[in-house]
Amino acid sequence: LKGWFDRVLVYGGLYSGSRRYNRGHFRGKTAMCSVTAGSPEQAFMPFGRAGNMVEWLWPMHASLYYVGFDVLVPQVSYGVQGGGIRYQGEGTFRKQLEQKKAAWAERIPTLSCEPPIPFTGWDDWDEKGVLRQDHPMRWRL
C-alpha cells in the first residue's frame, strides 16, 4: 500500500504546497481503512505484543488526510485466524466471524453520519506552520 501511495499521490498531481490537508484535492470526500488482523484485539492495544493499532494505521490516515480526505475511524476485525495459527476452535471462530460481518453490515448504512477523525487544518497553524497557542490539541506538545 505504501508503494501505491508513493506512485499515485504525487506532488503536483494530487497535492502541492497550497493544496494539502483541508484544502487538498479530495476535500469533501471521505475515506476509511478496513483491516483484518490475525491476533486478538488485546495484542493491538497499547503495550500489546503487536503494537497499538492506532499507531499502525496513523501513516495511512495521515496520508489520506494530507490529500484532503475526511478519514473515518477504521473498520478493524481482530482475531481473523488463518495460516495455521489458531486462538480458538473452528466453531467459535466461525461464530465470531459471522458476528463481525453482521457488525460491519450494520455500520455501512451509517457511515455518512460518522464524524471524521480530527486532524489539524490550515487555520490551526500560525504563519510559521506551528500549532496556534489557543488550539485544543496544544496540550499534547
Where are these regions (language model features)?
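Helix-loop-strand module that forms the ligand-binding subsite of alpha/beta enzymes
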Residues: 1-61
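Glycine-rich phosphate/pyrophosphate-binding loop and the adjoining helix
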Residues: 47-141
